[in-house]
Curated annotation (Swiss-Prot):
The keyword Hydrolase does not apply. Residues 116-240 are annotated as: Interacts with PadC. A non-essential component of the chromosome segregation machinery. Positions the ParA-ParB-parS chromosome segregation machinery within the cell; BacP seems to be the most important bactofilin in this process. Forms a heteropolymeric, subpolar scaffold in the cell; BacP probably forms the core, BacO contributes to position and integrity while BacN does not seem to contribute to assembly. This is Bactofilin BacP.
């Protein structure tokens, strides 16, 4: 396949150029190379190569042998050999070609169809890349933080001292009993008062012995009389 430089060098012989100030609208066909520096709209069919310069704009469905896009293409490109998008190329559409080159920096939005694989030209199997096994490093288990000791409970607030009970009021002194005044008898004149005589002693009566006990030899029980009392004896005569 011819590169872009080779196509541009050979295009000096049979090459048609659409200048920057030219606008072609409609259907365009030809059997030679076409370089677009202006604007082409419609449908483009060539048996040779289409070259879109950085200043060129093509808004058409293109059917060519080779296509080199350095400008802007809006439409589908169907090439029998190759399609190349350079670094300055911008394309929106689908590409159908057996070989497609998209250089780093190009902008493309669409689908690419490179056809069926020819028999006898199966893609060579890529050698298996041996990737180094990742070395597993022992993961150090982080030590668990020690649980801080429980904070000591604050001491209870001091209890307020119980106020002492109020002092007991002193009880009133007992009333002093004054001795009663001596009773003076009326009619005694200037004589001094005399104390009253003591009350008479209690009269004690001796129980009489029963008839069956008259002849007993026990002497009668003497009667005790308090000191200062007069002794009074009562004698009863037995009636026969």
């Amino acid at each position: 396949m011819a590169t872009a430089k080779e196509l541009s060098a050979s295009s000096n012989v049979d090459n048609t150029v659409v200048g920057p100030s030219i606008l072609i609208s409609g259907r365009l066909t030809g059997d030679e190379d076409l370089t677009v520096r202006g604007r082409v709209e419609g449908e483009l069919t060539l048996s040779r190569t289409l070259i879109v310069e950085p200043s060129g704009v093509v808004k058409a469905n293109v059917a060519v042998k080779n296509a080199i896009v350095s400008g802007v293409v809006v439409g589908n490109i169907n090439a029998t050999e190759s399609v190349e998008l350079t670094r300055e190329g911008r394309m929106v559409g689908d590409i159908r070609a057996p070989r497609v080159i998209i250089v780093d920096g190009a902008s493309f939005r669409g689908r690419v169809d490179m056809g069926d694989v020819e028999p006898g030209r199966l893609p060579a199997e890529r050698p298996a890349v041996v990737r180094p096994t990742a070395v597993t490093r022992p993961t150090a288990t982080p030590a668990r933080p020690t649980i801080p000791a429980a904070r000591p409970m604050p001491p209870p607030p001091p209890s307020r001292p119980t106020p002492p009970p109020p002092p007991a009021r002193p009880s009133a002194p007992p009333a002093v009993t004054r001795p009663s005044a001596p009773i003076t008898r009326p009619g005694l004149g200037g004589l001094g008062s005399k104390p009253l005589p003591p009350p008479p002693p209690t009269r004690v009566e001796r129980a009489e012995p029963q008839a069956g006990q008259a002849g007993s030899a026990e002497p009668p029980t003497p009667v005790l009389v308090g000191a200062g009392a007069k002794k009074k004896v009562v004698v009863k005569k037995k009636t026969r």
